[in-house]
């Protein structure tokens, strides 16, 4: 196992390097940049994130047409006409764009190895402080969603396996598959319209993680307020998230039920409940429990972004989204580095969990 762990840890380095390199090249090739963002603010042509994404930025389009039609402009930045070139050079030095791309990339990697992510371009904070500030929101959302999905999926999968082929199995499979096919952000919008938009019911808060004056509440009231705000975001992610785990639990149980040791246990006169909970459950749950780290990372990656944006939860997903829109490169690459490193680490932990709970698995020899 030691050799396998060392090999996997060493494999993280080139994997992380490749992911960072590809994304760095894509970002460099993409139009726009932090200097152009600052120019748009300086000239008063900047718009908010929604306008840029929806394509309604008519001011920027007009500026681009003017830039392309003016043959005397030597600036390589859109909207920089009339701005002192010396000022642009100062901006390049301030943001580090006076150096070639490969030197900036190597310097960035060297800083990231020491977990020095620099300062945000447009926020008066260090990137590490920003990430640490937003991390509890994303972890809370991902962790509670994962726990609720496991709490629902495992009993449902066991019940489907016991009643395999029944009408309950058919209809429950239809429901979970349909729920899995609908994106979580559609559920989020539907829940807002129904339960917090004021159109039908106004039972839950529309945005945020806590109410104003949360610190002044009693300990129990703070817990209630916290889950009151998390109810709709978690529900929107849980509805479409338990299909895969439910079917995995069902298939794992069906595979174990048909094995010889179950037939032997029944032949000895053990009750069906004793057979299922005392023998089948322990073996069938190995693959389900071992997949918890990977499931948590998957939910954190795929569900957090849009859910945080829709419900205005100030977490890593919303931070990364704003960084991409505003071309805040330090926050963008730091978020990418953090999520990639977390994903690779949790994947290793998941594999090690398999080995711990099932000694038959040997990743060194690739045998079971």
Name each region found by the language model.
Residues 2-3, 136, 144-168, 184, ...:
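Alpha-helical transmembrane segments of integral membrane proteins
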Residues 1-29:
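Internal alpha-helical transmembrane segments
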Residues 3, 47, 53-82, 155-179, ...:
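Cytoplasmic juxtamembrane interface segments
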Residues 18-100, 200-222:
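Hydrophobic alpha-helical transmembrane segments of membrane transport/permease proteins
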Residues 66, 79-82, 86-154:
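An internal, D/E-rich "acidic patch" concept
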Residues 22-31, 175-208, 236-242:
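Membrane-water interface segments at the C-terminal ends of transmembrane alpha-helices
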Residues 12, 20, 43-45, 177, ...:
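Residue-level recognition of pore/gate-forming positions within transmembrane alpha-helices
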Residues 12, 134, 138, 174-177, ...:
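Residue-level signal for discrete positions within transmembrane alpha-helices
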């Amino acid at each position: 196992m030691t050799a396998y762990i060392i090999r996997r840890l060493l494999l993280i380095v080139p994997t992380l390097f490749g992911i960072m390199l590809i994304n760095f090249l894509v970002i460099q090739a993409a139009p726009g940049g932090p200097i152009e963002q600052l120019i748009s603010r300086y000239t008063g042509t900047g718009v908010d994130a929604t306008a840029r994404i929806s394509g309604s930025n008519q001011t920027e389009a007009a500026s681009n047409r003017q830039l392309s039609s003016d043959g005397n402009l030597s600036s390589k930045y859109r909207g920089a006409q009339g701005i002192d070139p010396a000022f642009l050079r100062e901006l390049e030095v301030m943001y580090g764009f006076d150096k070639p791309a490969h030197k900036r990339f190597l310097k960035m990697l060297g800083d990231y190895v020491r977990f020095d992510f620099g300062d945000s371009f447009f926020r008066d904070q260090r990137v590490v402080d920003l990430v640490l500030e937003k991390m509890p929101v994303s972890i809370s959302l991902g962790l509670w969603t994962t726990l609720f999905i496991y709490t629902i999926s495992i009993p449902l999968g066991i019940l489907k396996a016991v009643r395999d082929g029944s009408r309950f199995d058919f209809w429950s499979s239809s429901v979970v598959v349909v729920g899995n096919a609908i994106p979580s952000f559609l559920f989020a919008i539907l829940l807002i319209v129904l339960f917090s938009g004021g159109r039908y019911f106004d039972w839950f808060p529309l945005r945020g993680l806590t109410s104003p004056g949360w610190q002044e509440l009693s300990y129990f009231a703070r817990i209630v307020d916290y889950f009151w705000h998390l109810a709709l975001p978690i529900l929107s992610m849980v509805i479409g998230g338990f299909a895969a785990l439910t079917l995995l639990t069902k298939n794992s149980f069906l595979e174990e039920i048909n094995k010889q040791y179950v037939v032997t246990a029944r032949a000895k006169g053990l009750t069906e409940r004793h057979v299922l909970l005392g023998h089948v459950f322990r073996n069938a749950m190995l693959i389900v429990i071992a997949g918890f780290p990977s499931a948590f990372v998957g939910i954190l990656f795929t569900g957090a972004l849009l859910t945080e944006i829709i419900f205005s939860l100030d977490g890593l997903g919303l931070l990364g989204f704003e960084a991409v829109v505003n071309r805040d490169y330090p926050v963008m690459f730091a978020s990418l580095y953090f999520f990639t490193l977390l994903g690779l680490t949790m994947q290793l932990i998941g594999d090690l969990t398999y080995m711990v709970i099932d000694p038959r698995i040997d990743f060194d020899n690739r045998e079971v």
